[in-house]
A protein has these predicted regions:
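TRNA-recognition modules of translation machinery and tRNA-sensing kinases, especially anticodon-binding
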Residues: 2-227
């Protein structure tokens, strides 16, 4: 048999390519992170459930080092080292204390995006993500944005797509970057921005009608060779 590229690698590369086509650069960061980069810098309050040991995999007793729960940490590191404007996507693995079920895994793949510039609005965010959705799922796909909450964006939204059976399915979260996040990296208040995050397994499961996330990790050649 010949060799096959893993379906998650293929989907990740496609998503990166779509955003690269409109000027986004790719940024990377460490999987073992500080609590500051993962939570504090992203405006996550001390009481937020995401900080609990039941949700996050900590690497020390002081709860100061952890396996990142999101690739937003890369956005913080990039802004610490680069002046605005910023247009980046951050792909990579993330880790959470999830029990394995049909749609959850303690390790999964995510791509987060960040745009920081002068005069960016929610309309720019909406246009960017609608472009992505149509490039990935097809030009006839319907989308809608519904209000949501994330600590690091305000206002925040979830993006839903109308699937073949008429059901609306959530595919990603997004919003305008909270001013506190920009202040934490010493960006001038003349800059604004938006951010989003999407799960690669989620996209692959929808596109290819895969019913259980474990299929990606079992190395069954009968599954992998379909892609």
């Amino acid at each position: 048999r010949g060799s096959y590229k893993h379906v998650l690698s293929t989907v990740m590369e496609e998503v990166v390519s779509i955003f690269s086509s409109i000027g986004y650069e790719v940024a990377y960061g460490p999987e073992a992170e500080t609590s500051w980069h993962n939570f504090d810098a992203l405006n996550t309050p001390d009481w937020h459930p995401a900080r609990y040991e039941s949700d996050t995999l900590y690497l020390d007793k002081n709860l100061e080092t952890l396996l990142r729960t999101q690739t937003s940490t890369v956005q913080i590191r990039h802004m610490e080292e680069n002046d605005p404007p910023v247009y980046i996507v951050a792909p990579g693995r993330v880790f959470r204390s999830d029990q394995l079920d049909a749609t959850h895994s303690p390790v999964f793949h995510q791509l987060e995006g960040l745009a920081i510039d002068k005069n960016l609005t929610f309309t720019d965010l909406k246009g960017t993500l609608e472009f992505f959705v149509k490039e990935f799922f097809g030009s006839d796909i319907e989308t809608k944005f519904i209000p949501h909450f994330f600590p690091f964006t305000e206002p925040s939204a979830e993006v839903l797509v109308k699937w073949q059976n008429g059901e609306w399915l959530e595919i990603l979260g997004c919003g305008m970057v909270d001013p506190n996040v920009l202040s934490n990296v010493s960006y001038p208040d003349t800059y604004k921005g938006f951010a989003w995050g999407v799960g690669i397994e989620r996209l692959a499961m929808l596109r290819y009608n895969i019913d259980h996330i474990k299929n990606f990790y079992e190395n069954d050649i009968r599954f992998l060779e379909q892609f």
